[in-house]
Amino acid sequence: FEHSLEPRRVVSQAFAGGRAEAIEIEISSDSPVRGKKLREIGSDYYIVGALFRKSKVIIPHGDTEIQTGDLVTIVLQSGAFSNVINLFSGSESRFPLEFGKNILVVLENEENLKNLSESEFYTRNTKATSLSVLTREDLFDNNLESTDDTFKAILKDQEFEMHFKNKISTKDIESFVSDSSIGTIFYSVEEGMSKSKIKSLINISNKSNTPVLFSKSTYPYKTIGILINNDFGETSSNSVAFDLAASLSASLTAVNVSQPKFLQSEESSKVSDSIEKLQDLALSHEIQLDLENKEGNEAKIFSEMSNKFDLSVISTGTNQSWQSRKTVEFIAINSKSSVLYIPS
């Protein structure tokens, strides 16, 4: 929390009618670019114009190495601010603290217990501080052992709080999230689960700005899959995926599903720009990034490919269209891996 509040050592000035920006960043000891030469971090959407080091101005070239304490002046395209900040200033993994500090697991039947272990793994391997379990009172038919003892056996030494309901409604989940600091809602996806349930959870996620993980017990997360989009904000699915990959030492696979050539438009140039930004983020986080290009129906192809992933991270991005919402709903139901939905 203190890290999130720490003021960034960044000065910014827009020019060219807001189409460009000049920023000055002080390089910290944990910056991803510290010790790197400019030729290693070059990009088409920003340029390093000058360094101020030990009271001297340095006009940099490809072999100039960035050092701790440097004041770096960067000129960048509009919209690239957060990406450049992440690249140069460095950001310790902090997900899901941007959304909330606790994990909420919803258990509606005994079958959901297999997903409880995944929530324990998730809590331990993110910056979440505690685990809350919203469960039915009659979760077990036989009642041979107490619910508390069963949870303790599954969650090992992970601390948790139990909250009981006779029957868990969507309204109960929404109320719990609004009254607590929840960073992720964990919900088990079962075969035959209704689309309306998925839709309701996504609506809660968007309304409360709380990620929801549709759990399918595909942990540990060694490979994370994402759909390429052009949203690189601090709490975007792209940023969250890289945050998780860095903290879990996981690889990332970015999937671009294009329309047939005769239907393609200027979107192809946006995809190229997004790919370049993803490659820059992979370089700064030292994460293996694989790119997959496919053609056809985005939702179906990504769902089919998800057997290669342990976790899929998706969102509607900046495109809040009917089609993008349907894509998210389809993937949440049909993905072979657990799906983390990030609200936009």
How should each PLM-predicted stretch be described?
Residues 92-145, 149, 225-268, 279-287, ...:
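Small/aliphatic-rich secondary-structure junction motif
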